[in-house]
């Protein structure tokens, strides 16, 4: 007997062998029903839901009747006679509810009244019947052919749903969900999974995958030099030169830039080292010059190398009294590798033991022949302290710029390089970008490294708001979704959706690169652990005040890798050291380095409880020297900081002597007159010094405990505002063991 599905227009007679009705036999009657005109039963009589060729509605055959319907137009059920509900040919019985072919007997489940919402009960009441259900033979599911698995590698996007993954690979969704569950991933068919997870699952099924690269990536800038080389010469116009100042630590780089800009930036730098990257423009004779100032000394900073790549001219600062130093030589290497012209600025000519000729001879020995010695490298003698011959240096820069004819296309979509980035507590991600080609405008959609955004605000180094920035202009921008890396390329994108897709791909790659092993050690026991073969890698969590410092420190630490141990930064970020950072250090056995960054109280307590090693620095050279000595077993006794108390600045007022008195509330520990004080703003160190005065009311005191208020003057420092935090500490001598 062939299986078939009965439509609403098919005859009940034709389907009799396949369908059993809820009614009875041939008699009329209620649930039973013979041939009489019963209710839900159903022969050929005029019933509604029954269903032959009568005029039924949804169920019917060829007639126009209600749902079901026999050949006559009657009510539900019905045989041939006109009887009322009940059996036989008269009112009543018949063969009863379970009789004949239709009753509640053994094949009740095959009744057409058992499907969906259309049901007929034994009392003769009917409900709307929309679909006729067939026998088990008819209900057999249709055979579905399994999806064909592709041959060869398949391309998968950065993220996809389980359903999309199933369709792409030909693996059933249920199998994929089971495999994900075994891998520890609880998902549903609409859940998003990333490429790494999909590739692992695909490999379990013997399927090779490759990452899909969108066609839009073809227009993505990876090298700015390629962008400039691709410009039509007819579209190029002159632009200001971009100058980077390089040189040995304390040779006066920031002092020189300070003299050029006539500001006091140099006074705030720790140990003579520029800790923040800056980008500034100055003007001479109506022409602009852009200066980049990068952190630390060239020996250990990647930003110096990046600066040489984005710069047109390098001013190499050499002190007339110190001469050429190791970091001077490494700066020369950066310049030569970048292939940019160099100008030597011999600084500190006002020093008593200054000897410019000796400096020129040392430079010649290093392969830098100045013009006075018959070479092609200009040299200018200056005094940043006395601001002597500064204009002469600027004129030399403009002369070199004229010889090299620096140009860009101001009408192209903007492309530039990030020189500094940080997370501002009130403004969000803030980045300084040097526009190198095109014009950057407000409301431009941009792709910056692994993040995206829309330019909402833009201003120059003087704080003036701008609507656009032309080539060689440094600007601070707001509107990014995350903090980019120093050295990332900014590119204007026509479609923000495409930019986000590309940023997502880059984030995935960064996660892969950041993966590290979970073994680490404290700095004190580093050499001993290396000798015993306990570790092969030193895990570091790095927190700094700005993004540019992170890049500089990362490059510095990368120079310290040896065959015995590799340094691996498992996490980096800007701002306060948090409890999350400490928890990561606990799990990965890492040490935490705070560069001008301090822990919050919760993080400090967590670190003390679990013995997490947190080191604080404000000079990159000291940081690298400590780790280098630890790795070779040459650590000497140190003075370790012991934090004794914290206080919150509630108010400030100025004395007639111009000193600022900070009104404090001691929140933790105690303050003692002999302690050192560190002023923190938003978790970042802005001053480290000594206590000049400590008072309660008008009386000098030696100590103030937690829960009390006091007045305090910081020696030689007045930039204190309400909301700042003060940390009080002492130093104790500690013998290091290896």
Swiss-Prot record:
Where does the record say this protein resides?
Cytoplasm
Instruction: Show the ranges annotated as biased composition (Polar residues).
Output: 1-10
InterPro entries in UniProt: EF-G-like_DII, EFTu-like_2, IF2_II, IF2_N, P-loop_NTPase, Small_GTP-bd, T_Tr_GTP-bd_dom, TF_IF2_bacterial-like
PANTHER family according to UniProt: TR-TYPE G DOMAIN-CONTAINING PROTEIN, TRANSLATION INITIATION FACTOR IF-2-RELATED
Which CDD domains does the record cross-reference, listed alphabetically?
IF2_eIF5B, IF2_mtIF2_II, mtIF2_IVc
Coiled coil regions, renumbered to chain: none
The tr-type G domain is annotated at 238-405
Q: Which organism is it from?
A: Roseiflexus castenholzii (strain DSM 13941 / HLO8)
What is this protein's function?
One of the essential components for the initiation of protein synthesis. Protects formylmethionyl-tRNA from spontaneous hydrolysis and promotes its binding to the 30S ribosomal subunits. Also involved in the hydrolysis of GTP during the formation of the 70S ribosomal complex.
**Residue segments, region G4:** 347-350
What spans are recorded as compositionally biased (Low complexity)? 121-143
Write down what this protein is called. Translation initiation factor IF-2
User: Which terms in the Gene Ontology molecular function aspect does this entry carry?
Assistant: GTP binding; GTPase activity; translation initiation factor activity
Question: Organism classification, top ranks?
Answer: Bacteria, Bacillati, Chloroflexota, Chloroflexia, Chloroflexales
Gly residues composition-biased segments: 22-102
Q: Which UniProt keywords apply?
A: Cytoplasm, GTP-binding, Initiation factor, Nucleotide-binding, Protein biosynthesis
- Ranges for region G2: 272-276
| Classification via PROSITE patterns | G_TR_2, IF2
Q: Which GO terms describe its cellular component?
A: cytosol
| Binding-site positions, GTP | 247-254, 293-297, 347-350
Which Pfam family, just one, is annotated for this protein? GTP_EFTU
The segment annotated G1 runs over: 247-254
